[in-house]
C-alpha cells in the first residue's frame, strides 16, 4: 500500500482515526476508528452517501461510539504509541484495490468507506445492520461521482462542484425567497436575446452600484421558474458562482484551477441547461494568478468563445473600464447590457412591489406616503448613491427602527413605571421620619402611588393586548405568504383543485383575518405604521438636515422667510427680499433643478451685514449657523492656487487629498458656500465657477463629479463700496446701481455675471439700524452671561449711548462690536474675576452722564 496514492482528505481521515484512538486510550487503530473519523469528516460526501443508501448518520454515530466504549483502554504514562491493526491495514489495502479497479489514480474517502463494508469487522457489521452494503454503496458512489475519476490529490473538491461553489438562484425563485422584480423588462429582454445567441452568448450587466443589476438576474430566474421565457431557456437553471468559496482553502498551486475546471466541466456536461452568473465580474481578472499560473478569466475564455458556457456577468462602469476593457480578448466575449438608474416614479413602483416582503420581515406596516417619501427624499438629499438602492435602504432602516420600538416598552408606560419606583424610594425614606409633615407627605404619596399603579396596570394590559394582536397579524401574514407560494406551485403543476381551494377559499379567509387583526385603534400605545416622518427622520440622521425642512411645514417657513432673516440682519430689506425670492423659486420647483438652490453676488461696504445674512440663511435653511463653507478668496490670488479648490492634478503632491471645495461639498452636500472678497481672487477661478453656477456640478482632480444642486452660492465683494458709502442716508440704493455695476463689469466677465440669480446691493447702515444692532448684540451677551447664572439688564439710555458712539457710516456695524467689548465686556470680565459679580447676581447697564455704568442689583 502506497500512502502517497491517498488523497489529502483520505490522509486527513487516517490521521483523525489515530487521534480518536489516542483520545480513547486505545493501543490500535481499528476499522471502527476509521468509520468514526469518516462519519465526522467535513466535506459532507459520506453523509450524502449514507442518505442515498437509506442510512441515518446520527444513528450510526451513536452505535460506533457505543462499540468504541467497549474496547479495552490501555493507559500508559506519558501517552503510548498508537499502532495500525492488521484489520485497519486490510481495509486500506481493499480501498486501494477498489480505486485501482475503478480506474482512479488516487484513493478517496468514499473508497475507504466502501472498503469497510467488506470483511467481517465490527464496523462492517454496523454498516450492514443499517442497510448499507457494498453493492448499494458502489451504486451510490457511481451516481454521486457522475462518472468522474479521482485523478488528483484533491479529487473530492471536484465532486458536485456547482453545489459547493455556487448558489442556485432558480431554486430560490421556486421557494419564494426572492423579492418581486418590478420593471426592467427592456434589460431582461436584451439579456434573454444575448443568451439565445449561438456564439458569444454571454451578457454583462454594466451599471452604477445600487441600480439593480443583481435584481435583473433574480427577475430572469423568476421568469424561468414561471416559464415566461423562450423555449431555449425553459429548462435552464441560473447558478451564481461564489468566488470566495472557490478561492478559500486552495492552499496548493493548481488547486484553485482544479476547482474552477470542475465547475466548468459540470456546466459543459449540462448541455446548456446551466447559466453561470458571476457577480462582480472584474474579480475574474487576476484571481488565482500566481507565478506561472493562469488567472480565472483565461480559464473561461475558450468556453466563452465557443458558446459552451452560458455566462452572465455584472460589474460597475468604473470596474468594467479598469479591468475588463483592458483585456480585449475577454471583453469581446461578453456583450454589454447597460443598466441605467430608474427614475423616482419608477422607484416608487419598485418599492410598492417589494413592500409586502419588508412588512412580513419586520412585522410592521408601510404607508404609501412613506414609499413616496423614500423615493423623492432620497433622490433629492442622498446624492452620492443611486436609486432604487438608497430608497430601499431608507424603507428597511425605518422598518427596523419601528420594529425595535414595538418590541420595547412604550415611552408613556416607561415614564409611569419610573415615577412609581421614584415614589416607592421616597416612601421608604419618609417612613423613618416621625414628624407631622412626613406623615402627611406619606399619605399624599401613598394615594398618588395607588393611582399610578392602577394606571400602569391598565396600560400594561392594553399594551400586551395590542402586542398579541400584532403578533397574531404577523403569523397570519406568514401563513398568507406560504399559501401564495403553494398557489403558484399548484398552478404550475396544473393541480387545479388545490389551486382553486387556495385562491377562492384559504387566501381570502386569511386576508379577512388579517384585516380584522389590523383594525387597531390608531390612538393605541403601539405605532406599527411607518410614515413619511419616519423616512424623513432617517434622512435627517444621514445628512444632518432637520426633519422640518423636508416635510410640508417647510412651505409655511418659506412664506415668512423675510421675517425670520430680519431678526438677525438689520436694515437690508432689499437684500433679504432678493435672497428670499430666489430660494422660494427653487423650493417651489419652478427653477432649473440642475442649478444650485441660489447664487448671489453681495455688493456693499464693510460691516453692513453681507456675511451675517449668509449665516442667517444657513441657520434658516439648515438649522445651523455653521452650515457654511467659507472660502477666503484672498488666498487664491495666484493662478496655481486654484487647483487647491478641486485638488492637485495627477503627479503633484496632494493628489490623493482632494480639493478644499469639492471634498467639503461631497461630505456635506447641504450648505451655504461663501466665497468671501471674491474680487481678490485670480480671474481664472471664475472659469471653475461657471460650471457650478450653470450645471450645479464640478468634477474634481480624481474624476469624481461633485453635486452642488443643494448648495447656496454666495459671493461677497467690496467693489463700488465707496459709491455706496457716500450715498445720502435715505437715498434708494438702486439709483446708484448702474455706477456700482461699472466697477463690477470691469472685474467680472459677462458670462459669469449672467449665471448669477441675483446681484444684491447692500446700502450703508443708518442710526436707527445701529440702534437695533446694539439691541441684538446685548441680547447675545445676555445669553452668554445667563449660562453662568448672571442676569444682564440694560435700559434705553445704554442703547442710545452705544448707538451714538458706535455709529460710523464708513465701517458699518463692526466698530460697534469693538465698542461693546471696550465699554462693557472688559469691565464685566474684571468684576467677575475680582469676585464682585458671582452666580445668581443681576447686573444692570445704564448711562450716567457721558459714560456707561455697570451696577450690581443683588
From Swiss-Prot:
Q: Which GO terms describe its biological process?
A: cellular response to heat; protein refolding
Q: Where does ATP 1 bind?
A: 207-214
Any one cellular-component term (Gene Ontology) = cytoplasm
- Identify the Pfam families for this entry: AAA, AAA_2, AAA_lid_9, Clp_N, ClpB_D2-small
Q: Which InterPro entries match?
A: AAA+_ATPase (IPR003593), ATPase_AAA_core (IPR003959), Chaperonin_ClpB (IPR017730), Clp_ATPase_C (IPR019489), Clp_N_dom_sf (IPR036628), Clp_R_dom (IPR004176), ClpA/B (IPR001270), ClpA/B_CS1 (IPR018368)
Domain named Clp R: residues: 3-147
**Keyword hit for ATP-binding:** yes
> Where is ATP 2 annotated to bind?
604-611
- Region of interest called Linker, as start-end residue ranges on this chain: 342-544
- Where located? Cytoplasm
Residue spans making up a coiled coil are 392-523
| Keywords assigned | ATP-binding, Chaperone, Coiled coil, Cytoplasm, Nucleotide-binding, Repeat, Stress response
Q: Tell me the segments the record calls region Repeat 1.
A: 6-71
| Residue ranges of the region described as NBD1 | 160-341
Which region ranges are annotated with the description C-terminal? 765-858
Q: Which residues does the annotated region (Repeat 2) include?
A: 84-147
**Gene Ontology terms for molecular function:** ATP binding; ATP hydrolysis activity
Q: Where are the annotated segments for NBD2?
A: 554-764
Q: Could you give the subunit structure recorded for this chain?
A: Homohexamer. The oligomerization is ATP-dependent.
Domains (record comment): The Clp repeat (R) domain probably functions as a substrate-discriminating domain, recruiting aggregated proteins to the ClpB hexamer and/or stabilizing bound proteins. The NBD2 domain is responsible for oligomerization, whereas the NBD1 domain stabilizes the hexamer probably in an ATP-dependent manner. The movement of the coiled-coil domain is essential for ClpB ability to rescue proteins from an aggregated state, probably by pulling apart large aggregated proteins, which are bound between the coiled-coils motifs of adjacent ClpB subunits in the functional hexamer.
Function text = Part of a stress-induced multi-chaperone system, it is involved in the recovery of the cell from heat-induced damage, in cooperation with DnaK, DnaJ and GrpE. Acts before DnaK, in the processing of protein aggregates. Protein binding stimulates the ATPase activity; ATP hydrolysis unfolds the denatured protein aggregates, which probably helps expose new hydrophobic binding sites on the surface of ClpB-bound aggregates, contributing to the solubilization and refolding of denatured protein aggregates by DnaK.
Q: State the family it belongs to.
A: Belongs to the ClpA/ClpB family.
User: Can you name this protein?
Assistant: Chaperone protein ClpB
Amino acid at each position: 500500500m502506497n500512502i502517497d496514492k491517498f488523497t489529502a482528505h483520505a490522509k486527513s481521515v487516517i490521521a483523525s482515526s489515530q487521534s480518536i484512538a489516542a483520545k480513547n486510550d486505545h493501543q490500535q487503530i481499528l476499522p471502527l476508528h476509521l468509520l468514526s473519523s469518516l462519519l465526522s469528516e467535513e466535506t459532507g460526501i459520506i453523509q450524502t452517501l449514507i442518505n442515498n443508501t437509506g442510512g441515518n448518520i446520527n444513528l450510526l454515530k451513536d452505535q460506533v461510539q457505543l462499540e468504541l466504549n467497549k474496547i479495552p483502554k490501555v493507559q500508559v504514562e506519558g501517552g503510548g504509541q498508537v499502532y495500525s491493526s492488521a484489520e485497519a491495514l486490510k481495509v486500506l489495502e481493499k480501498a486501494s484495490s477498489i480505486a485501482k479497479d475503478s480506474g482512479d489514480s488516487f484513493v478517496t474517502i468514499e473508497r475507504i468507506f466502501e472498503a469497510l463494508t467488506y470483511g467481517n469487522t465490527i464496523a462492517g457489521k454496523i454498516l450492514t445492520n443499517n442497510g448499507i452494503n457494498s453493492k448499494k454503496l458502489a451504486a451510490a458512489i457511481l451516481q454521486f461521482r457522475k462518472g468522474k475519476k479521482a485523478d488528483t490529490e484533491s479529487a473530492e473538491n471536484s465532486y458536485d462542484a456547482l453545489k459547493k461553489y455556487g448558489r442556485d438562484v432558480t431554486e430560490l425563485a421556486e421557494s419564494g425567497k426572492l423579492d418581486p422584480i418590478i420593471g426592467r423588462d427592456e434589460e431582461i429582454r436584451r439579456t434573454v436575446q444575448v443568451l439565445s445567441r449561438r456564439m458569444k452568448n454571454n451578457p454583462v450587466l454594466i451599471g452604477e452600484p445600487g441600480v439593480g443589476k443583481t435584481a435583473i438576474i433574480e427577475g430572469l430566474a423568476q421568469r424561468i421558474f414561471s416559464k415566461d421565457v423562450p423555449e431555449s431557456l425553459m429548462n435552464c437553471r441560473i447558478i451564481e458562482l461564489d468566488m470566495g468559496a472557490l478561492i478559500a482553502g486552495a492552499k496548493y498551486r493548481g488547486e484553485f484551477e482544479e476547482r474552477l475546471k470542475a465547475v466548468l466541466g459540470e456546466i459543459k456536461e449540462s448541455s446548456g441547461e446551466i447559466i453561470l452568473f458571476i457577480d462582480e465580474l472584474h474579480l475574474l481578472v487576476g484571481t488565482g494568478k500566481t507565478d506561472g499560473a493562469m488567472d480565472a478569466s483565461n480559464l473561461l475564455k475558450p468556453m466563452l468563445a465557443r458558446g459552451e458556457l452560458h455566462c452572465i456577468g455584472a460589474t460597475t462602469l468604473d470596474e468594467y473600464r479598469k479591468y475588463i476593457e483592458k483585456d480585449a480578448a475577454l471583453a469581446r466575449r461578453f456583450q454589454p447590457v447597460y443598466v441605467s438608474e430608474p427614475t423616482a416614479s419608477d422607484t416608487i413602483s419598485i418599492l410598492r412591489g417589494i413592500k409586502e416582503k419588508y412588512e412580513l420581515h419586520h412585522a410592521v406596516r408601510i404607508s404609501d406616503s412613506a414609499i413616496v417619501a423614500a423615493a423623492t427624499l432620497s433622490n433629492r438629499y442622498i446624492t452620492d448613491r443611486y436609486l432604487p438602492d438608497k430608497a430601499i435602504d431608507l424603507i428597511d432602516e425605518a422598518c427596523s427602527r419601528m420594529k425595535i420600538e414595538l418590541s420595547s416598552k412604550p415611552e408613556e408606560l416607561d415614564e409611569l413605571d419610573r415615577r412609581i419606583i421614584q415614589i416607592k424610594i421616597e416612601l421608604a425614606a419618609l417612613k423613618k421620619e416621625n414628624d407631622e409633615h412626613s406623615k402627611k407627605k406619606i399619605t399624599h404619596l401613598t394615594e398618588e402611588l395607588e393611582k399610578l399603579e392602577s394606571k400602569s396596570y391598565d396600560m400594561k394590559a392594553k399594551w400586551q393586548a395590542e402586542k398579541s394582536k400584532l403578533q397574531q397579524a404577523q403569523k397570519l401574514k406568514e401563513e398568507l405568504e406560504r399559501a401564495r407560494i403553494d398557489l403558484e406551485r399548484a398552478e404550475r403543476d396544473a393541480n387545479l383543485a388545490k389551486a382553486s381551494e387556495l385562491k377562492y377559499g384559504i387566501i381570502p379567509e386569511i386576508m379577512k383575518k388579517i384585516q380584522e387583526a389590523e383594525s387597531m385603534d390608531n390612538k393605541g400605545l403601539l405605532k406599527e405604521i411607518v410614515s413619511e416622518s419616519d423616512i424623513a427622520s432617517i434622512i435627517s440622521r444621514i445628512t444632518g438636515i432637520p426633519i422640518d425642512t423636508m416635510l410640508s411645514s417647510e412651505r409655511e417657513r418659506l412664506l415668512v422667510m423675510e421675517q425670520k432673516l430680519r431678526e438677525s440682519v438689520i436694515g437690508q430689506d432689499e437684500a433679504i427680499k432678493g435672497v428670499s425670492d430666489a430660494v422660494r423659486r427653487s423650493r417651489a420647483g419652478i427653477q432649473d433643478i440642475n442649478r444650485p438652490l441660489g447664487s448671489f453676488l453681495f455688493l456693499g461696504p464693510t460691516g453692513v451685514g453681507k456675511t451675517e445674512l449668509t449665516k442667517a440663511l444657513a441657520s434658516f435653511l439648515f438649522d445651523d449657523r455653521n452650515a457654511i463653507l467659507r472660502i477666503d478668496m484672498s488666498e487664491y490670488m495666484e493662478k496655481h492656487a486654484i487647483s487647491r479648490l478641486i485638488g492637485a492634478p495627477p503627479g503633484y503632491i496632494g493628489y490623493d487629498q482632494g480639493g478644499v471645495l469639492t471634498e467639503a461639498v461631497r461630505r456635506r452636500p447641504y450648505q451655504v458656500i461663501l466665497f468671501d472678497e471674491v474680487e481678490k481672487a485670480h480671474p481664472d477661478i471664475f472659469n471653475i465657477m461657471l460650471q457650478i453656477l450653470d450645471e450645479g456640478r464640478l468634477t474634481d482632480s480624481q474624476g469624481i463629479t461633485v453635486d452642488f444642486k443643494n448648495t447656496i452660492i454666495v459671493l461677497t465683494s467690496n467693489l463700488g463700496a465707496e459709491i455706496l458709502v457716500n450715498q445720502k442716508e435715505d437715498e434708494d440704493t438702486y439709483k446708484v446701481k448702474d455706477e456700482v455695476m461699472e466697477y463690477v463689469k470691469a472685474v467680472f466677465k459677462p458670462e459669469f455675471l449672467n449665471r448669477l440669480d441675483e446681484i444684491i446691493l447692500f446700502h450703508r447702515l443708518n442710526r436707527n439700524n445701529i440702534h437695533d444692532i446694539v439691541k441684538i448684540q446685548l441680547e447675545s451677551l445676555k445669553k452668554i452671561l445667563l449660562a453662568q447664572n448672571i442676569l444682564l439688564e440694560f435700559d434705553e439710555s445704554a442703547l442710545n449711548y452705544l448707538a451714538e458712539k458706535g455709529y460710523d457710516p464708513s465701517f458699518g456695524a463692526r466698530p460697534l462690536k469693538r465698542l461693546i467689548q471696550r465699554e462693557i465686556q472688559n469691565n464685566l470680565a474684571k468684576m467677575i474675576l475680582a469676585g464682585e459679580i458671582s452666580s445668581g447676581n443681576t447686573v444692570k447697564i445704564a448711562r450716567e452722564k457721558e459714560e456707561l455704568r455697570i451696577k450690581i442689583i443683588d
